[in-house]
């Protein structure tokens, strides 16, 4: 069974514990990991150093050009190299932004795919999602991504993962095209997504095409959004809500109706040219039904948020739901739906 963590509602200490157990387990042979940003006193790196000292083969891909963290990452790289960890610095012209872990054991491998950095500080302030799986095709392809990082211009055919700059945009367009075709055939057709930014022209134009064909598109977009919803004949089937609340919304979740057999993806990539063309990013499918239900709950709560949500209307107004309030203020406030508070209470009670 797959496992998932939704930070900060779940503690990042659980992930640290996984790394620490891997570092001392006699069953574990190797650990591979991508690192983009690290905490000042990173427990992640300390666990990896412990693993190397215990004889595990540890490989770390670290991005030296992570904005504002260049000096920190250089220092951590030196410490890891001194401990016997094989450190890879990526490829000129491509930032390594994917969030991956591969743990090789004697009886099968485990991989982690995350939407956010393996950073204790971020995990207390950012909403991010991590899945852990032993699904063999995904495990093989995550391992192939590490090979791809070392030889990025070698052709690789990914079937499970969507990987940029390899084929992510092409595969996303194919998924949207399938929704258009299904709508034309009278089948279930919709797209639900939660991202930080949408600015990629090709994907925006494809979403317009899908909307014009009648595909329902519901988006939660926190930051930059070049897509204009609600334009008759173009985007009237697109609705966008943006949430600014206590935690920074950072997870990327994508759900496609697929004629009633929904397809779910999570990963590190926003729908921006830089993510699709100039970074190594990964979106991974999610097959576990319980995790799928959790992801759908997260996205749907995001659409419903009227307490901290704002309507992205294409006019640049970012109108807040139910504002201005009219008396009695307390009654209107009580009726508002706050997605982060709702998720917190539901996770707390499970």
Model regions and ranges:
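Core mixed alpha/beta domains of very large multi-subunit molecular machines
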Residues: 1-54, 64-75
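Active-site cores of enzymes that catalyze phosphoryl transfer or operate on phosphate-rich substrates
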Residues: 1-30, 109-175
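Glycine- and acidic
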Residues: 2-6, 27-34, 57-63, 85, ...
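Short hydrophobic/aromatic-rich motifs at helix boundaries and adjacent loops
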Residues: 17-21, 47-50, 145-149, 176-180, ...
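PLD/PLD-like phosphodiesterase catalytic module centered on the HKD motif
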Residues: 54-123, 135-139, 165-350
């Amino acid at each position: 069974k797959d496992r998932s963590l939704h930070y900060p509602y779940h503690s990042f200490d659980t992930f640290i514990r996984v790394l620490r157990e891997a570092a001392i387990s006699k069953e574990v042979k190797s650990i591979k990991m991508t690192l983009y940003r690290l905490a000042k006193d990173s427990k992640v790196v300390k666990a990896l150093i412990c693993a190397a000292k215990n004889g595990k083969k540890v490989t770390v891909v670290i991005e030296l050009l992570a904005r504002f963290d260049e000096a920190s990452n250089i220092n951590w790289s030196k410490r890891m190299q001194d401990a016997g960890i094989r450190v890879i610095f990526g490829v000129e012209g491509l930032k390594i932004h994917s969030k991956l872990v591969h743990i090789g054991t004697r009886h099968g491998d485990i991989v982690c795919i995350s939407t956010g950095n393996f950073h204790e500080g971020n995990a207390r302030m950012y909403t991010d999602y991590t899945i852990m799986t032993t699904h063999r095709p995904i495990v093989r392809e995550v391992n192939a991504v590490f090979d791809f990082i070392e030889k990025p211009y070698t052709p690789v055919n990914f079937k499970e993962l969507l990987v940029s700059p390899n084929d992510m945009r092409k595969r996303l367009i194919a998924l949207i095209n399938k929704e258009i075709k299904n709508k034309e055939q009278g089948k279930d057709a919709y797209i639900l997504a939660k991202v930080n930014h949408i600015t990629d022209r090709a994907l925006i134009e494809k979403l317009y095409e899908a909307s014009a064909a009648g595909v329902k598109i519901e988006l939660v977009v926190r930051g930059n959004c070049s897509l204009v919803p609600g334009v008759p004949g173009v985007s009237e089937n697109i609705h966008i809500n943006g949430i600014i609340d206590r935690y920074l919304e950072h997870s990327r979740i994508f759900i496609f109706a697929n004629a009633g057999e929904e397809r779910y993806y999570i990963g590190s990539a926003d729908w921006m040219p830089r993510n699709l063309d100039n970074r190594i990013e990964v979106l991974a499918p999610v097959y576990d039904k319980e995790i799928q239900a959790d992801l759908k709950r997260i996205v749907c709560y995001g659409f419903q948020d009227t307490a901290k949500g704002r309507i992205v209307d294409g006019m640049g107004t970012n109108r807040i739901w139910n504002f201005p309030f009219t008396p009695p203020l307390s009654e209107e406030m009580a009726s508002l739906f706050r997605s982060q508070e709702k998720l917190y209470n539901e996770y707390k009670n499970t």
